[in-house]
Amino acid sequence: MDFLHKATLLEQTLNMEIGEQVKKLATYTFSNFIRCPEVQQAIASGEIRNDMPHLRFVYIFYLFKKIQDFIGDTEVFGIYEKVMGVERANSAKLVDVVQACTEMRPHIQAQICEHIERLTRGQGENVLWEVLRDGVISSSKLLKFVKQQTPDSKIFNPIPIQKNHYVASPVAFGVRNETVVKKLISELVVEEGIGCVTEFGFMLSPNDGIFGVSLDMCTNASMSDHNTVEFTSTTTIYEIKCRYKYLFSKCDYDPIYQAYQKLYNSPGRQELIDFIQSIQKPTVEYVSRGRLPTQNDYLLSFDRSWDFGPPKRKRKLTSGHKITEQCMKYNCYTESKVIILTDPALTSGKIEVKGSFFVDIYINPRHAYYHQCMLQYKIVTNYVQLTKGDSCKHTHPGVFLVSAFFRKRNSADFPKTYIKTERSFVDASVEIPVLLIITPVFVPHGPLVDTLEQAIKFWQVAVKEEFNHWPWAPTSLSAVGDVTP
C-alpha cells in the first residue's frame, strides 16, 4: 500500500473512471495501513509505540492526508495541522505522527471522530463508512465477539455489507421502514420542540479506537454550524427494530390480523398479549425470578401471562451469570410503553395515536439487541463528556429500543398516508405502521466494563492472527472515560 507515499489519491486516480477511483479509496483500510512495510518495520523495531487508540489516529492522519483533496473536505486533516503545525504535519515522518497522536488530548480525538461521523453519513451507501469500520467492533456484532463466534464476522477485512437487497427480503423491509418509525417518534412520541437527529454516520470510539457504532436516531441533539452532531446532557438514543416476521395482511384469514383487530378496538394488556402470541415466534419470553433467560427473544417478563410455549425448565442464575443477573436487576422493574396507531384506511389517510398503555416487559440482557444498545450508550456517553466539558462530565444518555409492527397495504388504503399532519407523508412503497413498543434500556457500569474487556481481549487475539507485528490494546481501555451511572 502507498499510505506513506506523497502522491494523493486524487493525483493517483486522475485518469481513472469513477468506479475505479472508488475501488482505490476502498483499499485505504486500517488493516492495509498496519500491513504497510514501513509500519510493520517500525513496530517490529520498537521505533514507534503501537498501542491503541493512538495507532488508530495515526492511520486516520495518513488516510485523510491521502484522500482530503479527493473527497473535497479538509476538516479532519486540518485538526492535525492545528495540533502539529501546518509545516510539520505536511512533512512529518511516521515517528513524528505517532508521537503527536500519542500526546493528543482526548477532546481533540473526539473532534476528529465528530467529523468522521459527518463524512460517513449514508452508512452502507458511503464507501468511507465501509473503509473506516475495518478493524472495529460494531454494536451489532458485539455479542458475537464477546462469545467469540465470528466465522461470518471478521474484525479485519470484513465481508462488505450487501446493499442490493431483494425488495421482499427481511433486510430490505427493515431498511425502508426505519424512516417511517423515525417520523413516528419525532411526531408522536417526542414533545414538540425537542431536537431530533435522524441520520448518522460512523461514530468511532475516541477512547479506544476499537469500538464503533452507527445510530438510528437521537433526541435532544442538534447540528452544529460545522454540521457535526451536538449531543447534550439529556440526549436520548432510539434503536429501531422493524422485524419482518411481525408483518401481517389486513384480511380475515391472517391470524395476526384477527388478534390485531381485537387490540385495535380495545387497546389493553391482555389484547396485546393475545396479539403477540398470534405471531409464529413471539418476541416476549416468560422467565421466572432467579432463572436464566434464553437468547431467543429480546423482551422478557416475569408474568406467566406471557408464557406462550410448552413448559420448559430454565437454568438457575449462578455466579457464572453475574453480568446477566446485574443487567436484569437494572431493567426488570421497568415497563415498556405501547402505542396503538390509528388505521389510516379509517381516518382518511391520517396516522396518529389511538391509545397507549404500559406493560410489564423489559429487555433481555442476553440478546444481541441489548449489547447493541450497551455499546451505543457507552460511545455517546464518551462523546458528550469529551465535547461538553466539565458541565457534562457525569451525564449519560437515555436509551430506548423501539419495536415497530406493520401491516401490508391493500386496496382500502388511501393513496396518500401521513403522520399527524400533511407535512409528514409516508411513502407509498412502505407498509402501514400499526403499533410501537418502546422499551427503556439501562446499562450498569460493572457489566459494561466487563463486556468491553472481553471484547478487547478477543480483538487482541484477532489482531495477532492477522498481522506479523500488531497494535496492542490493553484491557484497561474498557474503563477509559467516566461511564459510571
Curated annotation (Swiss-Prot):
Residue(s) at site: Required for function: E178, D216, E239, K241
Which keywords does this chain's UniProt record carry?
Answer: Decay of host mRNAs by virus, Early protein, Endonuclease, Eukaryotic host gene expression shutoff by virus, Exonuclease, Host cytoplasm, Host gene expression shutoff by virus, Host mRNA suppression by virus, Host nucleus, Host-virus interaction, Hydrolase, Nuclease, RNA-binding
Q: Return the GO cellular component terms, semicolon-separated.
A: host cell cytoplasm; host cell nucleus
Annotated GO MF terms: DNA binding; endonuclease activity; exonuclease activity; RNA binding
Localized where?
A: Host nucleus; Host cytoplasm
A Pfam family of this chain: Viral_alk_exo
Q: So which domain of life are we looking at?
A: Viruses
Q: Which GO BP terms apply?
A: symbiont-mediated degradation of host mRNA; symbiont-mediated suppression of host gene expression
This enzyme's EC code(s): 3.1.-.-
Q: Does the keyword Hydrolase apply?
A: yes
Its family remark reads: Belongs to the herpesviridae alkaline nuclease family.
The cross-references to HAMAP family, in alphabetical order and at most eight, read: HSV_AN
Record note on quaternary structure: Forms a complex with the DNA polymerase, the DNA polymerase processivity factor, and the major DNA binding protein.
Q: What does this protein do?
A: Plays a role in processing non linear or branched viral DNA intermediates in order to promote the production of mature packaged unit-length linear progeny viral DNA molecules. Exhibits endonuclease and exonuclease activities and accepts both double-stranded and single-stranded DNA as substrate. Exonuclease digestion of DNA is in the 5'-> 3' direction and the products are 5'-monophosphate nucleosides. Additionally, forms a recombinase with the major DNA-binding protein, which displays strand exchange activity.
Protein's recorded name = Shutoff alkaline exonuclease
Native source species: Alcelaphine herpesvirus 1 (strain C500)
Its ancestry begins with: Viruses, Duplodnaviria, Heunggongvirae, Peploviricota, Herviviricetes
Question: Which gene holds the coding sequence for this protein?
Answer: 37
